[in-house]
Amino acid sequence: MATFFGEVQSVFSRAVDEEEEDEDDDEEEEEDREIIAELERKREVRVTWNPELTAAIESSPGKRLPCSSVILSVGDNATGFVSSYILSSGSWEVAGSVTLWNERCRDCNVRKDFLPAPSSCTFYRSITDPTVLLCQCNCHVAEDQLFQWCEKVFGSLEKSSLKVTVLSTCPVSEYKTPESTYSLPVPFLKALRTSEYREEVPCPLLEQPNIVDGLPAAVLSHCQVLGIPAVFYQCYTDISKLDSVTIKAFRPLLSSGSLSRLAADSANIQETLRKTVKLNEIQSNLYI
């Protein structure tokens, strides 16, 4: 309808009335809620144990698995160290897995061997001491999934005598120090522990204002809140990919603490280390 300049028309003169707009808004909101709910279901962290451990959890009084030690390796070099220096002993069995989905982790599969999986969190249990669990995590755990990961993993374990050890790597460029990083003996280890962790550590403690993030930080914070003794070993390196030099930088950890009694024979270590590095080189060459 024609009108003169400056006249204010009623909103009901528009082609779509308010009731139709409200219906459209309600439909959009309902669709948004369904999308959000579907994403939440898709991003849920799921912990699966093998049938034997599932039965043990169900039969225990607190519905939790007896556990004295959890060793968590995060990233290629940390999992490479665990594969070569600990799992190569052969006295381990697949115990379970953590599966999740996010923008950087879309296909998590449980591995049947001891090589680092390309995208998974796999649990192994010591055959000689069934209370010792080891977890290799090569997949990215998104920020909104970190709390879920900690709650569901540690919610399955008896915590009364539990100790936690976490291993990971970080670019040396992120290490904060008054001196130049060029003068540092890269790679090198730093440790960060909870207030309940009383054992000596075989490397210097991480100095302020350095911080840790991701899954190691979430696990350490979770243990601090629950009063679980935990220590995190961070290897600072100038090599981003998996390599034997960075893997070997973790060797001082085998001289003390809970890892000392888990070391494999030297022959098995060297053979597995060679295979691990060679396999990574072959996979890297596929993209050249």
Curated annotation (Swiss-Prot):
Disulfide bonds: none
UniProt-annotated stretches for the region Disordered: 1-33
Keyword GTP-binding attributed: no
A biological-process GO annotation: chaperone-mediated protein complex assembly
GO CC field: cytoplasm; endoplasmic reticulum
Protein keywords: Chaperone, Cytoplasm, Endoplasmic reticulum
Post-translational modification: Degraded by the proteasome upon completion of 20S proteasome maturation.
Biased composition (Acidic residues): 17-33
Cellular compartment(s): Cytoplasm; Endoplasmic reticulum
GO MF assignments: proteasome binding
Protein role: Chaperone protein which promotes assembly of the 20S proteasome as part of a heterodimer with psmg2.
Protein family (similarity comment): Belongs to the PSMG1 family.
Subunit relationships: Forms a heterodimer with psmg2.
Annotated protein name in UniProt: Proteasome assembly chaperone 1
Organism: Xenopus laevis
